[in-house]
A protein has these predicted regions:
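Pre-Walker A adenine-sensing motif
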Residues: 1-13
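Hydrophobic anchor at the beta1->P-loop junction of P-loop NTPases
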Residues: 22
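Conserved lysine of the Walker
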Residues: 30-31
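Short glycine-rich substrate-engagement loop in P-loop NTPases that contacts/grips substrate
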Residues: 42-71
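Conserved catalytic/switch belt of AAA+ P-loop NTPases
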Residues: 84-102, 106-108, 115-117
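Interdomain motor-coupling "hinge/lid" segment immediately C-terminal to the ATP-binding subdomain
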Residues: 112-225
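Accessory nucleic acid-recognition modules appended to NTPase machines
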Residues: 176-347
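Domain-level recognition of nuclease-like catalytic cores that cleave nucleotide substrates
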Residues: 385-406
Length: 406
């Protein structure tokens, strides 16, 4: 069983909050993680079960009853949002920590029937698909070490083909163990089930084909800049509808929006966001890309590797709220794939290069940013599929992709 990095965060949150919401995409491992927690006394329910769901909806206050010292674990809380008000009533009468652990595959802020946010009573923990560091049982401190310019040595090798293979196989625990054909079928069923069943918890879908088209377009545009109006024109769907569907897909944790870094006073800084799929395997399998086709096609390889690096950086950043991920682009076509900002304002720039050959040209945007926009300390790294960490001037390093897993 793979140990999840967020296990300690969930346990810590249960000691601090009356209610904890463990949230993330379907099949990323929330229920498994909840079952691994060393809780003294628990009562568990899953709202995916129809009879359980009916019972919860018919008598929410009775359903959430608990004994002293007991943690009630409720899976897929978005299926019976009526329970949230009942839980609020219970915890307002009892300040004990760790009373309820609610897992969910939808962001409760976007669930249609939610009328109370449980603000001040609830702690939220995001779980993502398996990161490289979890698979390789790493320490999960890559970002911290990158800020310190203390890069790991003796890293298990990971060449371009190996990295693409990991990305295409995905970090979904069930899918990653399948062969390629079974995995593609799994992802098609996965996406269909989300759109047909789970989407109804978030928004009203009048045209399923339109929602499916928007999801396909977002996968195709994953890790690329685009305008919503452009997507609306190409898909033949109204702009407002596209915006509604994108919000719903984000609410189900199928996509993340990475906003632009805009804290400089340079007038040409771009203001467009990028969208990344929750997992690079979702992109490759739904779009029908084989590992060989990704390896042989630079555009596909770049897209998949950037998405894969994002999901790994995001898993690392989730471990500590002092980190925030953004991206940079300006009207002069200078681009930095990711800017990681620490709460004290110190910046880490991250570029992604699928290949193993690189040179000074690969650092030009990082060095320009450091000279013209970074107000204080700045470290720039290029993640590549080579074996060694190489220095390209003060504060600039080529770092093996495999370091993400240390």
């Amino acid at each position: 069983m793979i140990e999840r990095w967020q296990k300690d965060e969930v346990l810590s949150s249960l000691k601090c909050f009356r209610v904890v919401n463990l949230t993330g995409a379907r099949q990323c491992g929330k229920t498994t993680l909840a079952g691994m927690l060393p809780l003294a006394s628990t009562k568990r329910f899953t709202l995916d079960d129809e009879e359980t769901r009916k019972a919860a909806k018919s008598d929410p206050y009775g359903f959430v009853d608990r004994a002293d010292g007991e943690t009630v674990v409720i899976d897929e809380i978005q299926k019976a949002p009526e329970l949230l008000n009942a839980i609020k009533m219970r915890v307002d009468k009892n300040n004990a920590k760790g009373q309820y652990l609610l897992t969910g595959s939808a962001n409760l802020h976007f669930v249609k029937a939610v009328t109370d946010s449980l603000a001040g009573r609830i702690g939220r923990v995001r779980l993502r698909t398996l990161a490289l560091g979890e698979i390789r049982r790493g320490h999960g401190d890559f970002i911290e070490r990158a800020f310190a310019r203390d890069f790991p040595r003796d890293i298990p090798p990971l060449d371009k083909r190996g990295a693409i293979g990991l990305a295409a196989r995905s970090g979904y625990p069930e899918a990653m163990e399948m062969d390629a054909n079974a995995r593609r079928k799994w992802f098609r069923t996965y996406l269909d089930d989300l759109l047909v069943k789970d989407m109804q918890d978030v928004t009203e879908i009048r045209k399923l084909d339109a929602m499916r088209a928007v999801a396909q377009w977002l996968l195709a545009y994953s890790s690329r800049f685009f305008e919503v109006s452009e997507l609306a024109t190409k898909s033949g769907i109204g702009k407002e509808t596209v915006e509604t569907y994108i919000s719903a897909l984000k609410a189900l944790y199928l996509f993340d929006e990475v906003r632009p870094w805009t804290k400089g006073d340079y007038s040409k800084i771009g203001r467009r966001s990028k969208y990344f799929a929750a997992d690079a395997g979702l992109v490759s399998n739904i779009l029908g890309w084989t590992e060989d086709s990704i390896y042989m096609n630079d555009d596909r390889g770049g897209k998949i590797m950037e998405n894969w690096v994002y999901q790994n950086l995001a898993s690392l950043a989730d471990r500590d709220p002092i980190y925030e991920i953004s991206q940079y682009r300006d009207s002069n076509k200078r681009e930095i794939d990711f800017i990681v900002e620490r709460s004290d304002g110190v910046l880490l720039g991250v570029e992604v290069k699928a290949g193993s050959a690189l040179g000074a040209e690969d650092f030009k945007h990082l060095k320009w940013f450091a000279k013209n926009l970074a107000k204080g300390e700045f470290t720039g790294i290029v993640l590549y599929s080579g074996e060694h960490t190489l220095r390209f001037g003060e504060g600039f390093y080529a770092v093996p992709l495999a370091a993400l897993g240390t």
